């Protein structure tokens, strides 16, 4: 099985909250697609709650679009990581990590403005696969944690695992 890019970085030294360009690729027509690692929690130290992550998924995807989409950037998808330490964001364009960090911060401020559970978008049986698994309070706790710290920028060069280390890990 091929080793995915996300497993080529050293999770033991990964900071949070922080932004990382996880991948850049070009479509056959020449459009740039950038995948960002938006790390909310330090891996293997903490993780977002299940209900909070799910609620944040519903809120964050819309709010960050409000602050980052532009004539040169269009978000394709914002999805939580299975490890619940962050989100991946795929988009057309190449915004800087700093631009992404600013939009992320503004989106977290927007989360804190949501007043009621009933204000969570697409929270119904028809549009959500597990509509009972939500908590606005837990999503707000996650947002507050992000806003307490400055969102940093991760360096792939510093995080990449050497070929020697990957081999020693069985890859």
From Swiss-Prot:
It catalyses: S-(5-deoxy-D-ribos-5-yl)-L-homocysteine = (S)-4,5-dihydroxypentane-2,3-dione + L-homocysteine. It comes from the Bacteria. Pfam families: LuxS. Binds 1 Fe cation per subunit. Fe cation binds at residues 54, 58, 128. Gene3D superfamilies: S-ribosylhomocysteinase (LuxS). It comes from Aliarcobacter butzleri (strain RM4018) (Arcobacter butzleri). Belongs to the LuxS family. The gene is luxS. HAMAP family: LuxS. Involved in the synthesis of autoinducer 2 (AI-2) which is secreted by bacteria and is used to communicate both the cell density and the metabolic potential of the environment. The regulation of gene expression in response to changes in cell density is called quorum sensing. Catalyzes the transformation of S-ribosylhomocysteine (RHC) to homocysteine (HC) and 4,5-dihydroxy-2,3-pentadione (DPD). SUPFAM superfamilies: LuxS/MPP-like metallohydrolase. GO terms for biological process: quorum sensing. Homodimer. This is S-ribosylhomocysteine lyase. It is an enzyme of class 4 (lyase). Keywords: Autoinducer synthesis, Iron, Lyase, Metal-binding, Quorum sensing. Its cofactor is Fe cation. InterPro entries: LuxS_sf (IPR037005), Metalloenz_LuxS/M16 (IPR011249), S-ribosylhomocysteinase (IPR003815). GO terms for molecular function: iron ion binding; S-ribosylhomocysteine lyase activity. Its EC number is 4.4.1.21.
